[in-house]
């Protein structure tokens, strides 16, 4: 391992409209090629659509609820022991938990069939708040893998 000091985490500024750090982080995940204005338009469009569909319900609350539902608790990591590779279930650190949830949400929204990305994202977010959708399927798949390989949990890292 390198003996240099640990690089400090960069502070992410909250997003301009809602003042939320997690939303700003998700904006950076959605952004492609440094086009933050496009990412902003996609996310704010999705949140506006959620507000139209569910009047009186806070879209930011729906976003946080969806992310909370998608976050994985455990995942599997490959570990080589005596010439065999084992899928060892490990607990996911909180920062990685958030990153995986955002990445899965983006990928699931991309794969949907709606016309615009903001519409896809809005529908994926609404489904995730109800516990269904592509991102939730991905989380359940990861949890199933960890459950199936519970026998190898004594090979901790």
Curated annotation (Swiss-Prot):
PANTHER family: RIBOSOMAL PROTEIN S7 (PTHR11205)
Disulphides: none
Gene Ontology cellular component list: small ribosomal subunit
CDD domains tied to this protein: uS7_Bacteria (cd14869)
Family in the record: Belongs to the universal ribosomal protein uS7 family.
Signal peptide: none
Biological source species: Polaromonas sp. (strain JS666 / ATCC BAA-500)
Function of the protein: One of the primary rRNA binding proteins, it binds directly to 16S rRNA where it nucleates assembly of the head domain of the 30S subunit. Is located at the subunit interface close to the decoding center, probably blocks exit of the E-site tRNA.
A molecular function (GO) term: tRNA binding
Lineage: superkingdom: Bacteria
Cross-referenced HAMAP family: Ribosomal_uS7_B
Coiled-coil boundaries: none
Subunit comment: Part of the 30S ribosomal subunit. Contacts proteins S9 and S11.
Xref: NCBIfam families: rpsG_bact (TIGR01029)
UniProt KW keywords: Ribonucleoprotein, Ribosomal protein, RNA-binding, rRNA-binding, tRNA-binding
An example Gene Ontology biological process: translation
Keyword Cell inner membrane set for record: no
Family annotation (Pfam families): Ribosomal_S7
Name this polypeptide is given: Small ribosomal subunit protein uS7
């Amino acid at each position: 391992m390198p003996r240099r000091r640990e690089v400090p985490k960069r502070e992410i500024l909250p997003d301009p409209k809602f003042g939320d750090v997690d939303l700003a982080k998700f904006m950076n995940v959605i952004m492609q090629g440094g086009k933050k204005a496009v990412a902003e338009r996609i996310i704010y469009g999705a949140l506006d659509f959620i507000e139209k569909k569910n009047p009186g319900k806070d879209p930011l609350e729906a976003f946080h609820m969806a992310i909370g539902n998608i976050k994985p608790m455990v995942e599997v990591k490959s570990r080589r022991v005596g010439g065999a590779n084992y899928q060892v279930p490990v607990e996911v650190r909180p920062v990685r938990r958030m990153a995986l949830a955002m990445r899965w949400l983006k990928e699931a929204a991309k794969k949907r069939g709606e016309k615009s990305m903001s519409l896809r994202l809005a529908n994926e977010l609404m489904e995730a708040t109800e516990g269904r959708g592509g991102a939730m399927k991905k989380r359940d798949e990861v949890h199933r893998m960890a459950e199936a390989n519970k026998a190898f949990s004594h090979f901790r890292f």
